[in-house]
Amino acid sequence: MGTDIGAFNGTAALAAHGLSKRFRKKVALDAVDLAVPAGSVTALVGPNGAGKTTLIRVCMAFERPNSGSVEVDGVDPWKHRGEALRRVGYVPQKPAVYGGLSVDDNLAMAKSLHSGFDIDYSRRRLEQLAIPLDQRAGTLSGGQAAQLGLAVALGTRAKVLLLDEPLANLDPLARREFIQVLLDAIRSEGSTALLSSHIVTDVEDACDRLVILGGGKIRLDCPLEEARRTHRLTDADSPPPGATAVGSFLGRGGQKIMTLWRLASDGAVEGNDAAVAAGADDASLEDVVLGYLAAGRGTGLQFN
């Protein structure tokens, strides 16, 4: 099944056109087209090795693509790298924390490297979380270190935030705190975020758009609510009325092969009742991701 892209006609804060990247024989990105709406929080979801980190690194001008182009807030990072990077805040999975320095000295280090860095803004974000500025950074918990990395990114007052699996090593409470600080900042600043994760349940409460990346290709790109509304799940091959098969995977408990179906967007409301009558269940976002990844692998199976 090809890429499925939901309707989007607004302004893109981050755009990729025909983006491809290869590492020797491995295709990391395969003709990726992506438009992240301004003011949105977009979830970039896919398994390890899907190309999520490569996509973010190309957008940051850390990796040069083999073909295609990128625009960050209207600026090509490969033609105007300095200007583009001033518009981007970057949060890697493992933030660069200087363990021998205090939290505040880490912020001062960031200020010395970024001319527009707002150190007071970052301090306020950390103080909201009761993280002492005089604490040695090497003694921070994993969640606190992640918050420090986010505070550094937010201190740039960037219009676009790129977050590469920042929740991967956090416990549930730390994840919740991280998401809350991120959303507060986005609402107050009017910025845009692309938040990558290999677990959709980690990010579904924070995001309003879902992009599924598998095998270097975008498998689905649509508003989060549309992904929920237009997909159904059955344990049989017979389709719900007006539905198209997406992919099949082994369901929870390993007892049944489940099939994900997509209803036509314009008939989703009417199709819901018919789908339920035909024995179809609501599909969770995890089910949606599994179905599209299974279709992309061409095997028909994606173990849950």
Stretches found by the model and what they are:
Residues L14, L29-A31, L85:
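Conserved structural motif at the start of ABC-family nucleotide-binding domains
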Residues G68-D76, E83-A84:
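Conserved ABC transporter NBD signature motif
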Residues Q93-L148:
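ABC-family P-loop ATPase nucleotide-binding domains
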Residues E177-L263:
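ABC transporter nucleotide-binding domain
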